[in-house]
Amino acid sequence: SDNVYAIDVEAGKVIWQKHFEYQPVTEGRGLREGDPLCPGGQTATPIIGPLNASGGRTVYALAGDGKLHFLNLADGEELETPVKFGFGNGKSYALNMWNGVIFTTTSQGCNGNPNQVWAIDIHDPQKKVMTFNPKSGGLWGRTGAAVDSTGRVWAPTGDGVYIPEQHTYGNGLIGTKVVDGQLQLQDWFEPSNWAWLKKRDLDMQVTPSIFPFKNHELMVTG
């Protein structure tokens, strides 16, 4: 629907509503009519940023045309010009944020959108989009990528092949991080029985949960 709502949860009232207006998306391969896996429109859950110097907060929302919007949490007004962050109708998943960098992931190749991790530094005047592509499998975690305590961004890769010497990381987990202005692979995990899992369509599809436990940092997915 390309709508964002701010709701007072105590009063049960809508404080403001923002609808994103844009021309029909013409880039990419176009939507597959009737395909529930590529619905088009806004599919990424917005995220609220930390307090800024003036004591306000920004809501970051990715509209269905592939543009990232910067909204005032107090009233929903645009704080700056929206910027491109992926293809329109590209089925981006929930946004996440770490030290001023916003992340999202994509799957299904909707409208020709590559299946990869996406990042954009909101403090970069150029708003350069950074990506890492595992070259196999969609990144299916509905709540996007998870961030560990070191700033590495983790996402599961769907059914695909694992050929690390060809930088192909399907059917596993990839951990990326922004280094020197680029989103780079830092680590990955691949089940020893990945081919067996692929054959049975048992790939990992859940955004990881990351938490501390007894002097370790654990990550759980499924």
At which residue positions do the language-model features occur?
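Noncatalytic, solvent-exposed loop/strand surfaces
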Residues: 1-222
